[in-house]
Structures are given as C-alpha cells and as structure tokens.
Amino acid sequence: MKAINIALDGPAAAGKSTIAKRVASELSMIYVDTGAMYRALTYKYLKLNKTEDFAKLVDQTTLDLTYKADKGQCVILDNEDVTDFLRNNDVTQHVSYVASKEPVRLFAVKKQKELAAEKGIVMDGRDIGTVVLPDADLKVYMIASVEERAERRYKDNQLRGIESNFEDLKRDIEARDQYDMNREISPLRKADDAVTLDTTGKTIEEVTDEILAMVSQIK
C-alpha cells in the first residue's frame, strides 16, 4: 500500500485517540495525538497562572513528541515529559479555551503539518481534515451520543484514578461541543469529503475494522 495520511476528527470523547492508535498499529503507521499538544500548552498556561499573553507563551515554548515502547507517544514540554499530567480535570476544563487562541493554534498546526510531511501518519483532533491535513487520503468524522461519550470519559478517569461525576461530565462535554463548534479559529466541523462514523454502541474492534475497510478501498 502506498504511504497515506489519515485524519480522524470529532468532538470530545468520541473515541478518536483510542481508534487512531489502533488503526496506526494495524497499518504500521505513526500516530500523532494533536490533542496532547493543546493539553501541554494548557498545562503551561495553568502553570503560568492563566496568562493571557499567548503569543509570549508559545514563543517561549519548546514542544516535541517522542515515542517509547512502554508508553507510546510522550509529550516533551520545555524538556520535561508532561504526558502523565495532561488528562487531569483542570487541563481538561481549560483546553478548549487555550486551543481557541490564534497564537496557540498557529504554533500547534505548524508542528502538526511538519510531522505529516513525510506521510504515513494517523492524526486525530478537531480540525485535522479541514485545516491541518486538507489533502489527507482518508478523512473520518467520528461521532457518538453525549451519554456514551460521558460514560467513556468517566471510565477513563476511573482507570487514571481521577475523581469525576457522570452528570458533570455530560454537562462539560455538551459545553465543550458548543465551544469547539462556535469558536472563530478552526472550529470543529466535518470536512466536506469526510466519512461520518457513528461509534455509539460499537466496540473498539468494530470501529477499527470499519476504518481499515475504508483504507483498503484507497487506490
């Protein structure tokens, strides 16, 4: 098969990262978690007491992705591995706000485009098919019900030892959907040539197989 790029987009907790990792593994491609980049910048924003000078924040930031056999993708922020801090509730609650800022978006998108230049990439996020990889060979827009997405996030938090309330998670996800879809810069939307894939009620294996079937149709 020729080298291709795959873009997976969709709202929070639609299963993008889980599926992207699985698809990349099955196809021996490289997985890039763009959300982790925005989470890392949000983590720094919080450490800087919620600075509003986002241009200065990114100008004084180094951000790299590395890969370890035991951990997968690791996020190196200013020479520190911050991977284990990126899923805490404080980061989750602020990431949409930080990601909506133009300097942050431009900084992250530039890095994402550089990573995808050689092809062989599976990338997931909110604007991959529309902004980062508009020429991706396959674009999938993943959706799921709010209830199922909240349940996934709740179980994920349990596994990570993070306390959370199911109803609060539902409200947070609904609010984040509205914020992501209505922001001025790179809003969440389906690319015109993307395939919609509803993951509600489906297993990881079922969704992975559906995407692999799509890949097999690429000439």
From Swiss-Prot:
Gene Ontology molecular function, alphabetical: ATP binding; CMP kinase activity; dCMP kinase activity
Family: Belongs to the cytidylate kinase family. Type 1 subfamily.
Keywords tagged on the record: ATP-binding, Cytoplasm, Kinase, Nucleotide-binding, Transferase
Enzyme Commission designation: 2.7.4.25
Primary enzyme class: transferase
Superkingdom of source: Bacteria
Pfam family, one: Cytidylate_kin
Chief location of this protein within or outside the cell: cytoplasm
BP-aspect Gene Ontology terms: nucleobase-containing small molecule interconversion; pyrimidine nucleotide metabolic process
UniProt subcellular location: Cytoplasm
Reaction equation(s) it catalyzes: CMP + ATP = CDP + ADP; dCMP + ATP = dCDP + ADP
Sequence positions that bind ATP: G10, P11, A12, A13, A14, G15, K16, S17, T18
Name of the molecule in the record: Cytidylate kinase
Presence of keyword Hydrolase: no
Gene Ontology CC annotations of this record: cytosol
Name of the gene: cmk
Keyword Kinase: yes
